[in-house]
Structure formats: structure tokens, C-alpha cells
């Protein structure tokens, strides 16, 4: 047994434990695939401990060590595929796992030349054939990147595997180089945003792939230079560190999202709404433009909750959120600011007529009956509009103005655009809703 591998087993095992601890209860499919990959790396080092054993056990240990290393890389690559749920993506994973394993086994046990040739052809053309067979149903640039990588690998294997001397070593390093360079490309595609964890992971995978390129070059041209195994294994630890940072970054982003969004509807909550409204008003004040605040309150929502249950009420709120999201511009903001209250910030060049048009459009959409839990639910909405700076010149007064007009709207039974205030009250009254709450709209 090679006891020098024990520190690597302990180190990678501890990293895998730390990874599992960070993932914790929020273990996603991606992080579970990553964890499986790191357990395979632990298996890789464990098998290397038994590799010096003579006979069958040593050969099996070598095969397990190589296969687990390629399986881990294939899983890391697949975890970063944005279309994992696509059936052809799963077929591609199994094809790569099978063809890599077949070639490594044929190479390691010294299989006949025809078997090596067939395995190399399968490894090089298998992804291409699968991509062409599923082209009508699905296509993606990452899929074609994989095709190019493995087609190039197939050509390389056919050219070096029969070379005397270091041919088998070059072929083996070529397979591992392709697997981990594919990880680098896939992670770069998925995590292109400039975060520390993404940068470290991508660089780590690139360095990991370069190990299988530099090692044969060193043996060929600088055989006298000795590099310790810890140096070759360093990229593995860099990737592990990067993945742990990625998990932490994603959890921080998730917590930020939960703090600023409504859990039920996914819309911005009151806190984020007020932040965005503050920014909108500052921008409008700086550019001399107007902004509108639209407040909508659902009609008969309490009746839905009382008669059909809170579950149906929740479904109603989610449906309303989807409707509003589908009709509001990207530059605008729709938020859930109360139990059955929604608020909309209308940015850019806007005026009372445009804001009223948006409010009426949303109002009309809610007139349509909704099918929830095989039940037809009818609701409606009352809304109020306030324009900055015509109705108020600060956030609090603008919200009060819109709220008061919405509540007057609920009490009234008619639409009366004529009552919209035409003049701006004196600045001394800016702490109160401007227009005296005379604007009246109702469903």
C-alpha cells in the first residue's frame, strides 16, 4: 500500500465534509452532484493507495482510480449544464461515462488494437452522433462545444495510442485533459458573472486540465526535474475552495432575495419597493421628469379567504402577481406591499393619463374570472394614482396620496377623471396628500 496517499485522502475527505456542511439543509441538485464528484475524488485517492499491489488487485485499483477521476470530471461538467433536465443531456452524460470508462479500461489492461480503435472512435464521434440525432428537438452551444472537444480528442487518440513508448500515457492524459478542460468551459459559461468563487473555480479547473498537459511534456523534455505530487494535486484543492465559495455566495444572494422579496408571490416586498421608489424619485428630481405611483387593492379578497380557504387566497395572490408582472414594463416595479395590496412604480416620461391607463388596464385584467383549484374565482381591484412632483414632492406624501385615492376609490362607485387636481398646492402642504384626495376611480 502507498501510505503517502493518506494525507491526500484526509485532505479531500475534510474538504468534502466542509462542502457538505456548507450546503447543509439547502442541498440543491447542483451541490449534490458536486458532492458526489468529490466523493469520487476521495475514491480516486483511496484506490491509488492500493495501486502498487501486484496482480489483479493492483490492476483493479488502477482502473478504479482512473475511472473515478473521469467520472468526477464528467459530473462536475454536467452539473453546470443549464439543460440537465433535457433527456438528451442525461443520454450525453451516460455516453461520456461509458465511452471514457471503456477506453480507459482498454488502454489500462492492454486491450487489442481493434478495441482501442473502436473505443477511440466511439469517444470521438458518440457526442456528435447523439447531437445530430436530437438536433430537431434540442440544440445548445454548450452541446456543440462538447462535440468539438471530444471529436478533437478522438482524432488525437487515434494518432497517438499506437505510438511506441509513451503513446498510452499520452492517450490517457489526453482523455483527462479533455474531461477537465470541458469542466472549465462549462463553468465559465454558467458562472460568467465576476464573483470570487466563480473566478477561483474556473481557474482551478483550467489548472487541473493543464496538469495532464504539462506532466507528459515535463517527462519528455525535463525528466530530471522532480515535482512533488502535492503540486500536481494543488488544482483540486483550488477547485474545492472555489466551489465552497460559490455555495456561500449563492446562499448570501438567496438570503438577500428572501429579505427583499415576498415569499408567496416572489415580488419585491415593501422594503425593496421603498428603496426603488426612493431611487426613482431622486432620478426624476435630478432629470426634471415625472414618476407615478399606482396602488391597487383587491376587492372581495377577504370573502375568498373566508369561503374558499387561505390556500385559494394564496393562489389568487400568485395569479394576480403573474398577471401584473406580464403587463408591467421592465423599467417599472410591481411589488406586494400588503396582504392584498400591490404597488406599481411607473418610471420614465409619464403623466396622469398614462398612469390612469395602466391602472385601468390592470383593473380590466382582474375582471376576468380565474380558475383556481377547479373553482371559478371572481375578484377586482380599486386603485389610486399619485404623480411626482404634481401631487407630492417626497416619498411619504406620495404614498399617502396614492393610498387615500385608492380608499376613496373603494368607497366610490364610479370613475371620475374630472376630479383629478389640476394645480399643485403650496409647498407648505407637501407633507399631506396633494389634491385633497378628490381623485376618484373605482371598479
Show where each model-derived region lies.
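Conserved nucleotide-binding and Mg2+-coordinating catalytic segments in signaling enzymes
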Residues: 256-275, 296-310, 318
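A short pre-motif secondary-structure segment
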Residues: 333-336, 377
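Hydrophobic framework residues that shape the active-site pocket
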Residues: 301, 320, 334, 342, ...
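Juxtamembrane segments at transmembrane-helix boundaries
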Residues: 14-31, 47-221, 226, 242, ...
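Hydrophobic transmembrane alpha-helical segments in integral membrane proteins
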Residues: 1-14
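Short helix/loop segment flanking the catalytic signature motif in cyclic-nucleotide metabolism enzymes
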Residues: 316, 329, 343-364
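Catalytic-core segments of nucleotide cyclases and related cyclic-nucleotide turnover enzymes
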Residues: 352, 356-363, 367, 371-373, ...
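Signal-transducing coiled-coil linker helices
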Residues: 199-201, 207-264, 271-281, 332-333
Amino acid at each position: 500500500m502507498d501510505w503517502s496517499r493518506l494525507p491526500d485522502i484526509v485532505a479531500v475527505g475534510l474538504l468534502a465534509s466542509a462542502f457538505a456542511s456548507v450546503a447543509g439543509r439547502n442541498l440543491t441538485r447542483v451541490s449534490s452532484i458536486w458532492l458526489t464528484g468529490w466523493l469520487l475524488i476521495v475514491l480516486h485517492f483511496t484506490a491509488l493507495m492500493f495501486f502498487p499491489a501486484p496482480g489483479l488487485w493492483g490492476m483493479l485499483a488502477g482502473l478504479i482510480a482512473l475511472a473515478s477521476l473521469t467520472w468526477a470530471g464528467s459530473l462536475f461538467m454536467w452539473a453546470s449544464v443549464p439543460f440537465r433536465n433535457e433527456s438528451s443531456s442525461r443520454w450525453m452524460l451516460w455516453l461520456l461515462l461509458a465511452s471514457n470508462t471503456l477506453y480507459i479500461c482498454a488502454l489500462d489492461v492492454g486491450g487489442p488494437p481493434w478495441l482501442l480503435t473502436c473505443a477511440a472512435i466511439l469517444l470521438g464521434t458518440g457526442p456528435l452522433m447523439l447531437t445530430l440525432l436530437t438536433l430537431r428537438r434540442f440544440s445548445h452551444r454548450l452541446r456543440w462545444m462538447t462535440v468539438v472537444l471530444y471529436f478533437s480528442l478522438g482524432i488525437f487518440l487515434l494518432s497517438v495510442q499506437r505510438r511506441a513508448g509513451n503513446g498510452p500515457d499520452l492517450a490517457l492524459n489526453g482523455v483527462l485533459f479533455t474531461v477537465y478542460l470541458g469542466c472549465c468551459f462549462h463553468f465559465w459559461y454558467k458562472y460568467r458573472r465576476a464573483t470570487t468563487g466563480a473566478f477561483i473555480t474556473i481557474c482551478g479547473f483550467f489548472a487541473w486540465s493543464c496538469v495532464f498537459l504539462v506532466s507528459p511534456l515535463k517527462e519528455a523534455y525535463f525528466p530530471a526535474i522532480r515535482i512533488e505530487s502535492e503540486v500536481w494535486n494543488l488544482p483540486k484543492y483550488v477547485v474545492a475552495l472555489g466551489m465552497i465559495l460559490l455555495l456561500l455566495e449563492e446562499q448570501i444572494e438567496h438570503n438577500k432575495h428572501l429579505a427583499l422579496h415576498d415569499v408567496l408571490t416572489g415580488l419585491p416586498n415593501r422594503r425593496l419597493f421603498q428603496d426603488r421608489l426612493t431611487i426613482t424619485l431622486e432620478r426624476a428630481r435630478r432629470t426634471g421628469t415625472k414618476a407615478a405611483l399606482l396602488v391597487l387593492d383587491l376587492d372581495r379578497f377577504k370573502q375568498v379567504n373566508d369561503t374558499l380557504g387561505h390556500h385559494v387566497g394564496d393562489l389568487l395572490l400568485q395569479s394576480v402577481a403573474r398577471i401584473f408582472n406580464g403587463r408591467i414594463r421592465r423599467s417599472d416595479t410591481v411589488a406586494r406591499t400588503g396582504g392584498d395590496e400591490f404597488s406599481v412604480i411607473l418610471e420614465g416620461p409619464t403623466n396622469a393619463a398614462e398612469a390612469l391607463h395602466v391602472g385601468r388596464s390592470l383593473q380590466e385584467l382582474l375582471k376576468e374570472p380565474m380558475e383556481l383549484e377547479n373553482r371559478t374565482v371572481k375578484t377586482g381591484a380599486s386603485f389610486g394614482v399619485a404623480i411626482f412632483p404634481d401631487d407630492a414632492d417626497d416619498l411619504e406624501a406620495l404614498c399617502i396620496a396614492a393610498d387615500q385615492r385608492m380608499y376613496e376609490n373603494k368607497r366610490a362607485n364610479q370613475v371620475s377623471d374630472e376630479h383629478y387636481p389640476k394645480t399643485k398646492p403650496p409647498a407648505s402642504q407637501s407633507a399631506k396628500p396633494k389634491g385633497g384626495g378628490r381623485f376618484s376611480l373605482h371598479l
